[in-house]
Structures are given as C-alpha cells and as structure tokens.
Amino acid sequence: MLVHPQFDPVAIHLGPLAIRWYGLMYLAGFIMFLWFGRLRIRQPHIAARGWVARDLDDMLFYGVLGVILGGRLGYVLFYKPGYYLTHPLEIFKVWEGGMAFHGGFLGVLIAMWVFAKVRRRHWMEVTDFIAPMIPCGLAAGRIGNFINGELWGRPTDLPWGMIFPQAGDNIPRHPSQLYQFAGEGVALFIILWLFSRKPRPMGAVSGVFLIGYGAFRFLAEFAREPDNFLGLLALKLSMGQWLSLPMIVIGAVMVVWAYRRGNGATAAAR
C-alpha cells in the first residue's frame, strides 16, 4: 500500500515570498512550450510558413493570459457558479486554487484568435502550430496536482492504490493525477509531435489534439474522484467527461473536414 508523501505545497521560501510547487509547474510548462516551440520552427514545413522565435514569445504572452483568465472563469462557470455568484470577490483569489482546463482551453483559443488577427495569420494555422506543445503544460500541471495531493482518484484495491491523507478517509485510491500525466501529457505529446512532423492539411493537427485530449480525459475520469460539490451527472458521467465529449466530436469533424478540404495540399505548402 502506498501513501502520498504530503509534500509541502511551498517549494521555495524567499523571505515573505512563498513560491508554490503549482506555480513552478506552470513555469515549467511555459519553458517547455518555448523549448519545443523552437524545435518546431526548425522543421522545414513550419519554417516555410515564416514562423520565427519572436512568434513564440508573443504567443506565450497571449497564451498565459488565456490560460489564467480562461482557466479561472471556466472553474467559476462550470463548477461553482452558485458559490461565486454569492461570493464574487472570491473569483480573484486565484492563489487559493480553482482552475479548469476546459476554461483555460477556451481562453487560449480566444487568445490565439487575437494573435492570429494581429499577425494576419489564419487562426487554425496558429492552433495547428501550438497544439503539439500544449501537452507539455498539461503534464506539468498534473504533476503539480499530485504534489499538492489534490484531485485524487476513486477507491481501488489495485497494488498501486495510494492513500491520500488529504482525502481524510484512509482509503487507497487511484493516483489519477499520474494517469492524466501519462495520458493527456506524455502520450498525447508523443502522438501530436510525431503526427505534426510531416505537413498536414490545415486543421488536422488541431483536430487530433481535440480527439486525443478528449479521449484521454474521458477515460481518466473513470478513475478520478468526482468533485464532491457536483458528483456524477447524467448517465453517471462526471462534469469533466461531459465537457470532453464535445471536444472529441468537434475534433473528429475537424480532421475529416481538413482532409476533404485539403485535396493533397497542406497548410504548410500554401
């Protein structure tokens, strides 16, 4: 039987300043975005579109705003609208936690739409470019969840079941944060990186991301404990699963549309 080590959520103390692990994981995700982004712009079919390092820096700025604002508002609207309606000032206390990937994803989409308009690029060309790097941030975020001992899984009798003292029940549970790290982080990154190494029709890489994330998240939710203030919804699916299903459908439509529209041409070749 494994027991969660209960890491100190504060990684570094600098006088009165406390730097939390979760914040460091966000930073790690942004650094990996820049690192792999620079590798990506060296790929011939990407370089042919005129992508340069400065684009990465600007996209990161827009993306950070999208992640933070969208992630917070998504949590407020998708998970606790009633609470924040009566406690509106609590919305601004982001340091106390409460971020939603699906909200952050929508925030990034809006941010990239603005970036595309400013740079006069097609919005989907931008999303195709960044899609392979997004799992880096997802992986880092799930490690942050594990370090904090939050978003634990459902009870299990499997050998790797872990007791999370924060749950307060001394029951072995799935380390679902690590499942999500492996699925929507590592596996999705490998799939997207390999898929995007060759020229693809515009929208195809974005579509594969939506399918991959939606599928990995949907499956992982079967092992993840539902939020206690929501529980399971219709058909005994969690909120995360219901939000992931449209991503899978939209992603599939995008891939089919991209290849039918492409007629052998690719976004990189246009």
UniProtKB/Swiss-Prot annotation:
Pathway: Protein modification; lipoprotein biosynthesis (diacylglyceryl transfer)
List of residues binding a 1,2-diacyl-sn-glycero-3-phospho-(1'-sn-glycerol): R142
Key words of the record: Cell inner membrane, Cell membrane, Membrane, Transferase, Transmembrane, Transmembrane helix
Main location: membrane
Gene Ontology annotations of biological process type: lipoprotein biosynthetic process
Membrane-topology annotation of the record: Multi-pass membrane protein
Family label: Belongs to the Lgt family.
Physiological role: Catalyzes the transfer of the diacylglyceryl group from phosphatidylglycerol to the sulfhydryl group of the N-terminal cysteine of a prolipoprotein, the first step in the formation of mature lipoproteins.
Protein name: Phosphatidylglycerol--prolipoprotein diacylglyceryl transferase
Organism: Cupriavidus metallidurans (strain ATCC 43123 / DSM 2839 / NBRC 102507 / CH34) (Ralstonia metallidurans)
Species classification: Bacteria, Pseudomonadati, Pseudomonadota, Betaproteobacteria, Burkholderiales
